[in-house]
């Protein structure tokens, strides 16, 4: 991975004797060497692979934004920026029930010609190691893959387009942990691009395009399968869904209208590109539902062939149950 490291520093969030969260500040930035470059490269990779990230942009009166601008202009050094930001982060973090201890990392770097600032809290875990004398001893390590409190600012986008609503990305965190609220408060930012909504709009546009083109059922299934295959490949490779690229892979309507032209003519508010949402796009080829003790998923092409739905009686009929399910049912 091509990565150029400008600055990186670690501080520590820990509890004092009064069980209060405090910041233990490192006296200086880390040296830029192979170890720190490998650390930041792994942080970048893991953050990039995390699903369900949110987007945002700074509020006009954001203090953090002001400190960041000073640092980027050379009016404030990176260490001072990290120190003042670490203390602000701690003050916001103690307001939330997940005031975690951990290693706080600030990293300024460039990857693939894009400048980034990464901020994250890395959990510490214990493991075992074998010493040179073949004894067993405990060792602490950074559990980077488990980080769920992290944000990354695309500095290149921010500095060229401050009106953008997506230069700031953050991990939304686990259910019940208001990590999104915490980072928005800490950075003094507002929610930006809604990726879930973008994916839902895309699904609606696909449905409407198929209906407008008067496609037969099999043609609809094939069309949706193409959309799914493209979106799924983008998700797996960590790339965004590009509407123009997707449109180029899809057949036009009978009157020659491309999918992209259709979305523009009909006024769908789709961004040129956005991250795909796996749970949403899978509904292109599957019917999925859960509730009341039931969890049902089946290929959409089976509806009307082996699976039938009667809306009047709200009944789903399955003809030809899977062998493993049939075996379980026959035993009761």
UniProtKB/Swiss-Prot annotation:
GO cellular component: bacterial nucleoid; cytoplasm
Record HAMAP family: NdpA
Subcellular localization, as worded in the UniProt entry: Cytoplasm, Nucleoid
Protein name from the UniProt record: Nucleoid-associated protein VP2128
Family: Belongs to the YejK family.
GO molecular function, one term: double-stranded DNA binding
Keyword Cytoplasm: yes
Record keywords: Cytoplasm
Keyword Cytoplasm attached: yes
Alphabetized Pfam families for the sequence: NA37
């Amino acid at each position: 991975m091509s990565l150029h490291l400008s600055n990186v520093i670690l501080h520590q969030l820990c509890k004092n004797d009064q069980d209060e969260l405090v910041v233990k500040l490192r006296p200086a930035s880390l040296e830029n060497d192979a170890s720190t470059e490998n650390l930041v490269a792994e942080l970048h990779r893991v953050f990039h692979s995390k699903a369900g990230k949110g987007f945002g942009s700074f509020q006009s009166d954001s203090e953090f934004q002001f400190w960041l601008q000073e640092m980027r202009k050379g009016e404030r050094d990176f260490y001072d920026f990290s120190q003042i930001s670490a203390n602000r982060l701690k003050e916001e973090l103690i307001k939330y029930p997940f005031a975690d201890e951990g290693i706080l990392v600030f990293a300024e770097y460039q990857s693939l010609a894009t400048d980034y600032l990464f901020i994250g809290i890395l959990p510490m875990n214990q493991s075992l190691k074998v010493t040179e004398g073949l004894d067993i001893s405990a060792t602490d390590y950074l559990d980077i893959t488990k980080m769920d409190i992290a944000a990354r600012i695309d500095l290149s986008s921010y500095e060229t387009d401050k009106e953008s609503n997506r230069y700031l990305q953050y991990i939304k965190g686990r259910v019940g942990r208001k990590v999104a609220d915490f980072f928005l408060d800490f950075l003094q930012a507002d929610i930006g691009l809604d990726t879930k909504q973008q994916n839902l709009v895309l699904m609606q546009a696909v449905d409407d395009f198929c209906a407008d083109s008067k496609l037969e059922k099999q043609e609809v299934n094939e069309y949706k399968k193409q959309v799914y295959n493209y979106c799924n490949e983008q998700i797996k490779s960590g790339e965004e869904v590009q509407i123009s690229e997707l449109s180029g892979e899809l057949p036009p309507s009978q009157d020659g209208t491309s999918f992209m032209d259709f979305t523009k003519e009909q006024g769908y508010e789709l961004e040129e590109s956005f991250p795909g949402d796996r749970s949403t796009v899978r509904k292109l080829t599957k019917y999925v539902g859960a509730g009341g003790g039931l969890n049902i998923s089946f290929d959409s092409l089976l509806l009307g062939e082996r699976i039938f739905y009667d809306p009047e009686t709200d009944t789903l009929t399955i003809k030809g149950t899977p062998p493993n399910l049939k075996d379980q049912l026959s035993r009761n």
